[in-house]
């Protein structure tokens, strides 16, 4: 069972666990201390209970509630409404019994926090931080729960839940730093995101004012948490840079409980660390101000390749050829996220490409289509109808927001996913076609008997402005050479035991990730979409920035009040 695998994770944390008080220890805070904390945060301390508790015999059992839970079990909006709702992976130590995953004989919190503070003010964050430090208990930070590495979870911990800390969204026509003492190198428009808003909120707010912001593909992901602090990519990052490149200012609660503003003028080292060095470890960001840009027309191409029965080779080979062409279309301004996997036993490649147009003149649109046809679609046509079916559709939208609203972006919560990824530079894509084809086959077919399914994600979100290092950023330097972020996602079988789980994980790390590294040596990956068991995680996730980031961590959090799995400062 997957819970047994989580126990392996807990064992890996054992050295740290001995340093923090847990509910089994005499040093665990007394009921009176928890009551006092609850009073200080105005009754917003939550004793966490498993999401599906209503499905199990005992107090709280409800057949109707259980039915509702099962119906919403993979709905990301529903998941985010709980202080212990996690999208990747779903907490499966207490699944709804009538959901499409096997029931377990007991219902437990597992790795979820014991208590959560439903923070609505920065003062609540400061209170929770100081309480955790004073009582030597583990502290975790959670917004919406999109974290495949489980960094917002922690056994026996106190969680600060930021989803309901929402002080508003504010547009600045001409930005200047809070203290105005230095030049921020940006006097254009900006938006301050005050707390636990999601990208859909920010996109809607910006669109009503004729603007766009660089954010994530999934509208349910939180704006100012690990996504932004770890780099952040999306359909507009090629045009304007990574999401973290857009940050002009952070409001941060430090490990001491102090509430400060970090920007290019003050707390500059902390500001830099929070622009790419990962979330959950330097302080708690409660507000961020990011750049905005005028919206423009958007050209959209929907490309689908559907394999014929009993022919897997053709789609895999065609996918490899297309990947080798990505740098050419990236340099013409195209972006997008493609997926390839099996649907009803047939290989399907689905690629939504977009181009953020400077104008919607017929000349601009014709040129963009010519590039896509020349580099991608014409390459596929010889096999159309004999090896696979190709479908290509074009659509022009008046604005980026209109395109975003017309195309599905929300992904369901996934049970027991495992991910590995790698950033690829131009040379590794265009000059090693044979190796690239071999890689696609390894990722798609190796170890398939160990998983219940898998798919490959090709994120064309780099190149362009991403290649330009923005001042005061600490993102993995590999991003500044990257044209593609390639991800492999494998799903454990629902009934996988600990032995099967270990085999699947080992295959992902030692075979699939290793093959990616071999094709793109000297690169790295995106900290938020990486293999949690990569033995070279410091180098692969942070590159040459790690040692400097660690020095910032030690400066602002010498007692490790903030500690999370595979975060800077996690030396276990």
Task: Please place each PLM-identified region on the residue numbering.
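Soluble FAD-dependent oxygen oxidases
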Residues: 16-572
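Fungal secretory targeting signals
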Residues: 1-17
């Amino acid at each position: 069972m997957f819970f047994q695998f989580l126990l392996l994770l807990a064992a890996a944390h054992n050295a740290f666990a001995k340093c923090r008080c847990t509910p089994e220890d005499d040093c665990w805070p007394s009921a009176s201390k928890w009551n006092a904390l609850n009073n200080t945060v105005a009754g917003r301390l939550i004793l966490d209970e498993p999401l599906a508790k209503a499905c199990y015999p005992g107090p709280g059992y409800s057949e109707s509630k259980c039915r509702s839970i099962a119906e919403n079990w993979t709905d990301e909006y529903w998941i985010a409404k709980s202080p212990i709702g996690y999208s990747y992976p779903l907490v499966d130590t207490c699944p709804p019994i009538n959901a499409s995953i096997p029931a377990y004989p007991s219902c437990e919190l597992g790795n979820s926090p014991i208590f959560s503070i439903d923070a609505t003010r920065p003062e609540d964050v400061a209170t929770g931080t100081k309480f955790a430090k004073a009582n030597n208990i583990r502290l975790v930070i959670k917004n919406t729960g999109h974290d495949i590495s489980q960094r917002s979870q922690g056994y026996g911990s106190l969680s600060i839940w930021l989803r309901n800390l929402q002080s508003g969204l504010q547009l600045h026509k001409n930005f200047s730093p809070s203290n105005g003492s230095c030049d921020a190198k940006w006097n254009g428009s900006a938006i301050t995101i005050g707390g636990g808003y999601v990208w859909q909120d920010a996109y809607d707010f910006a669109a009503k004012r004729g603007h766009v912001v660089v954010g994530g593909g999934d509208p349910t992901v939180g704006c100012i948490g690990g996504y932004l602090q770890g780099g952040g990519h999306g359909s507009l990052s090629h045009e304007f840079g990574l999401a973290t490149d857009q940050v002009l200012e952070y409001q941060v609660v430090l490990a001491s409980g102090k509430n400060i503003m970090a920007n290019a003028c003050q707390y500059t080292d902390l500001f830099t660390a929070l622009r790419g060095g990962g979330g959950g470890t330097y302080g708690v960001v409660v507000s961020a101000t990011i750049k905005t840009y005028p919206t423009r027309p958007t050209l959209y191409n929907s490309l689908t390749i559907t394999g014929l029965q009993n022919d897997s080779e053709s789609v895999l080979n065609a996918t490899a050829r297309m990947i080798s062409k990505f740098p050419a279309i990236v340099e013409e301004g195209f972006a997008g996220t493609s997926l390839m996997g099996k649907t009803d036993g047939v290989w399907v490649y689905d690629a939504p490409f977009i181009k953020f147009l400077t104008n919607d003149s017929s000349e601009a649109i014709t040129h963009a289509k010519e590039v896509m046809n020349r580099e991608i679609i014409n390459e596929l046509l010889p096999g159309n109808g004999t090896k696979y079916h190709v479908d290509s559709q074009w659509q022009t939208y008046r604005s980026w927001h209109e395109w975003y609203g017309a195309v599905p972006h929300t992904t369901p919560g996934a049970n027991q996913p495992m991910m590995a990824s790698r950033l690829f530079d131009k040379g590794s894509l265009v000059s090693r076609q044979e190796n690239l084809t071999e890689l696609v086959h390894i990722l798609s077919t190796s170890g398939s008997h160990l998983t219940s399914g898998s798919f490959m994600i090709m994120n064309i979100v780099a190149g362009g402005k991403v290649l330009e290092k923005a001042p005061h950023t600490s993102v993995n330097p590999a991003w500044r050479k990257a044209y593609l972020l390639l991800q492999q996602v494998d799903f454990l079988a629902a009934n996988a035991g600990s032995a099967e789980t270990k085999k699947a994980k080992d295959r992902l790390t030692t075979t699939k990730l290793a093959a990616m590294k071999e094709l793109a040596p000297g690169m790295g990956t995106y900290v938020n979409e990486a293999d949690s068991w990569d033995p070279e995680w410091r180098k692969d996730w942070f590159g040459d920035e790690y040692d400097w980031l660690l020095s910032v961590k030690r400066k602002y959090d010498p007692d490790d009040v903030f500690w999370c799995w595979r975060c800077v400062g996690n030396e276990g």
